Amino acid sequence: MARTVHCIKLGVDAEGLDFPPYPGELGKRIFEGVSKQAWADWLKHQTMLVNENRLNLADARARQYLARQMENHFFGGGADAAAGYVPPTA
């Protein structure tokens, strides 16, 4: 049976994650209060940040930047927008 959480990002009760997606206290907070849909939305945004900012994930500073952005996305004022990203027009 799926876990249900009150998603702090979407503001609704939704299916929770199956396991903490990140190590440490931040991962625990995300596991306890973020839905699968909100996590999927973050992964899309994270991909845009990596691509648009040309981040090298082998660089510890890039990983620290993404961790800060993840925390801001879920628990702060929001993550940075991907610089230079233009959404596709339908």
Swiss-Prot record:
Biological process, per Gene Ontology: cellular response to oxidative stress
Alphabetical UniProt keywords: Iron
Keyword match Iron: yes
Top-level taxonomic group: Bacteria
Gene3D superfamilies per record: Fe(II) trafficking protein YggX
Signal peptide: none
Keyword Iron: yes
Any one GO molecular-function label of the UniProt entry: iron ion binding
GO cellular component: cytosol
Pfam families hit by this protein: Iron_traffic
PANTHER family to which the protein is assigned, alphabetical: FE(2+)-TRAFFICKING PROTEIN-RELATED
Function: Could be a mediator in iron transactions between iron acquisition and iron-requiring processes, such as synthesis and/or repair of Fe-S clusters in biosynthetic enzymes.
Family: Belongs to the Fe(2+)-trafficking protein family.
Protein name stated in the entry: Probable Fe(2+)-trafficking protein
Source organism of the structure: Delftia acidovorans (strain DSM 14801 / SPH-1)
